[in-house]
């Protein structure tokens, strides 16, 4: 990525660290990373590929991750959604808004559709959660809830997707050992009002599909980037 601009956004007692990757086009893109050891660097290759196509993007490290730091127990699903909102406000993003979310970040992206207009959603190996877990701080209590058998079936994501009228791209991994394939299938099926939607399954890939997909500038990479751009442009009309 060229000409990265670092920024800090305030969220409660935390200083969220992020960066802006500029682009030629007016579309505004926010990337939300997943859980575990993930941080905004997971999006480096995807954001670079977007920049090559003229699209700028913003990403940040959630509380408990990367440069932002802090204890993961100081955050939660609702906290992560609030952190994304804080970044959107700080960067004044909002016109032709695209949100890209990976794994846990995909659920935060979905929840953002309840807070503001989002033109395009790109969900990569998306996780969804029961509402019972939404406000529970990360830690043993949160883990106990989400580890209940098929707890994700009770998610509110299906309803949210049913109300979504923008464009939707879901990228699933054929050999994902974390996210049941039913989840991306049902997200697409639930998006009955979407103006454009597509489910893309990456053959032979596991849950860590994001880095491997964009590190290798293969014909598959170019094909999937075509889908990403189509999703962004389907609603923006650019």
Residue spans for each PLM region:
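Conserved alpha/beta-hydrolase "acid-adjacent" motif
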Residues: 177-183
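Hydrolase active-site cap/lid region
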Residues: 111-151
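C-terminal catalytic histidine-bearing segment of alpha/beta-hydrolase fold enzymes
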Residues: 195-238
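Alpha/beta-hydrolase active-site loop
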Residues: 74-92
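The serine-hydrolase catalytic nucleophile loop
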Residues: 35-47, 182
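N-terminal cap/lid segment of alpha/beta-hydrolase-fold proteins
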Residues: 1-23
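Short beta-strand/loop motif that positions the catalytic acidic residue
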Residues: 164, 170-172, 176
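Conserved alpha/beta-hydrolase
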Residues: 50-69
């Amino acid at each position: 990525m060229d000409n990265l601009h670092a920024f800090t956004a305030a969220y409660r007692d935390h200083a969220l660290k992020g960066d802006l990757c500029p682009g030629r086009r007016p579309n505004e893109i926010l990337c939300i990373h997943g859980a575990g050891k993930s941080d905004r660097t997971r999006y480096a290759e995807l954001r670079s590929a977007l920049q090559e196509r003229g699209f700028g993007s913003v990403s940040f490290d959630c509380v408990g991750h990367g440069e932002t730091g802090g204890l993961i127990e100081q955050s939660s699903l609702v906290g992560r959604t609030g952190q994304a909102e804080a970044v959107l406000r700080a960067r004044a993003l909002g016109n032709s808004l695209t949100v890209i979310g990976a794994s846990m970040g995909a659920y935060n992206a979905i929840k953002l559709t309840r807070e503001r207009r989002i033109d395009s959603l790109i969900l990569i190996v998306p996780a969804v959660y029961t509402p019972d877990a939404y406000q529970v701080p990360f830690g043993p209590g949160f883990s106990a809830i989400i580890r209940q058998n098929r707890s994700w079936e009770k998610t509110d994501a299906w309803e949210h997707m049913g109300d979504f009228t923008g464009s939707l791209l879901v990228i699933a991994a054929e050999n994902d050992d974390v996210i049941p394939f039913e989840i991306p299938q049902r997200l697409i099926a639930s998006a009955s009002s979407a103006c454009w939607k597509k489910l893309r399954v990456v053959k032979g890939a596991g849950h860590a599909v994001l880095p491997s997909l964009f590190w290798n500038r293969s014909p598959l990479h170019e094909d999937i980037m075509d889908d990403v751009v189509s999703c962004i442009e389907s609603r923006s009309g650019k």
